[in-house]
């Protein structure tokens, strides 16, 4: 890509960030109730509103662009090499979701684009090197993690096995890597469920620590939209095997199947004086979310003893 086009891309994404911030501010200023913020579909509504409000901006003249408008700039990307370079610039600069017109342009190259994205995702260093600061490490993998998330959004099935294999080889994944892998997995929905269940069953003897914790969270998110007996039974097994049971407890509460109440209450009853404060209260919250009664649960920390 020639230096002028690169400079124009950088300018475009700077302006995109400004417009994106204005759109978010306007939408959020119109939300007056905390109840609205807490609504289950709020994030989905927000994304749709942002998408709709941004559309006119792409067809407006932007000084400094040879093609006059952002839409014209993206349409002018003829080669995959140029489009990938613009994608890399966007991944480093854009504050929120990448522009849809850029994603459409990239998607127009079909399987070749998917292969390039997979190569880019796998080329990054997923483990922070010794002496490398967290921020420097994360800045260095922004492009690779953006490619990973796009592969998930596009449901590129050939990416699943290599990504899972690499992730599960990381003992203590960085938060950005872990969240990117989760964001990669969730859009696949029920397609990826058998793989996740198999991974969790295989990792159960090791206590399901590190990367497995994020697979549990991802499976739960998928299960909220694609509930199945297999997912519920897997989460039950995870609770019994998991070293950090607070994660499994929260996930059972989030998944929403009331059959988990006896499991959670039974565990609290048997381990009243063994559990820590965080686990106890997160599990109480999970039981309540599942419709269970907590009045008969002994409070080992006596925070509510006066009410009993």
Regions found by a protein language model. Name each.
Residues 46-63, 140-141, 153-155, 254-258, ...:
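Short, solvent-exposed linear motifs at loop/edge-of-secondary-structure regions
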Residues 49-54, 143, 216, 244, ...:
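Generic detector of short, well-ordered, non-transmembrane alpha-helical segments enriched
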Residues 40, 243-245:
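Basic amphipathic recognition helices
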Residues 89-96, 123-130, 134-139, 168-176, ...:
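Short coil turns that connect the paired helices of HEAT/ARM alpha-solenoid repeats
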Residues 80-90, 111-133, 156-169, 190-203, ...:
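Amphipathic alpha-helical scaffolding segments comprising HEAT/armadillo-like alpha-solenoid repeats
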Residues 265-308:
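Eukaryotic acidic, Ser/Thr-rich intrinsically disordered low-complexity regions
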Residues 99-112, 131-156, 165, 175-191, ...:
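Structural detector for internal amphipathic alpha-helices that build alpha-solenoid repeat scaffolds
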């Amino acid at each position: 890509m020639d230096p002028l086009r690169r400079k124009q891309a950088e300018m475009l994404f700077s302006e995109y960030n400004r417009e994106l911030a204005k759109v978010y501010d306007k939408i959020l200023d119109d939300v007056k109730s905390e109840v609205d913020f807490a609504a289950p579909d709020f994030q989905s509504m927000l994304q749709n509103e942002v998408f709709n409000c941004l559309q006119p901006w792409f067809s407006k003249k932007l000084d400094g662009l040879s093609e006059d408008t952002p839409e014209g700039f993206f349409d002018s990307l003829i080669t995959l090499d140029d489009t990938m370079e613009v994608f890399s610039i966007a991944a480093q600069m854009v504050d929120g979701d990448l522009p849809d017109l850029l994603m459409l342009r990239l998607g127009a190259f079909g399987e070749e684009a998917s292969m390039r994205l997979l190569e880019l995702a796998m080329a990054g260093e997923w483990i922070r090197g010794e002496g490398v600061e967290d921020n420097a490490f994360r800045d260095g993998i922004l492009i690779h993690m953006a490619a990973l998330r796009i592969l998930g959004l596009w449901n590129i099935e050939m990416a699943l096995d290599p990504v899972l294999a690499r992730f599960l080889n990381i003992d203590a994944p960085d938060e950005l890597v872990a969240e990117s892998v989760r964001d990669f997995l969730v859009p696949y929905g029920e397609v990826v469920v058998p793989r996740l269940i198999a991974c969790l069953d295989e990792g159960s003897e090791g206590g399901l620590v590190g990367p497995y914790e994020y697979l549990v969270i991802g499976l739960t998110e998928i299960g909220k939209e694609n509930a199945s007996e297999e997912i519920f039974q897997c989460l039950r097994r995870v609770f019994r095997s998991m070293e950090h049971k607070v994660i499994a407890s929260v996930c059972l509460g989030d998944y929403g199947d009331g059959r988990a109440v006896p499991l959670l209450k039974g565990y609290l009853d048997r381990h009243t004086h063994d559990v820590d404060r965080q686990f106890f209260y997160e599990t109480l919250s999970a039981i309540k979310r599942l419709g269970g009664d907590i009045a008969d649960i002994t409070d080992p920390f006596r925070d509510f003893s006066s009410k009993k």
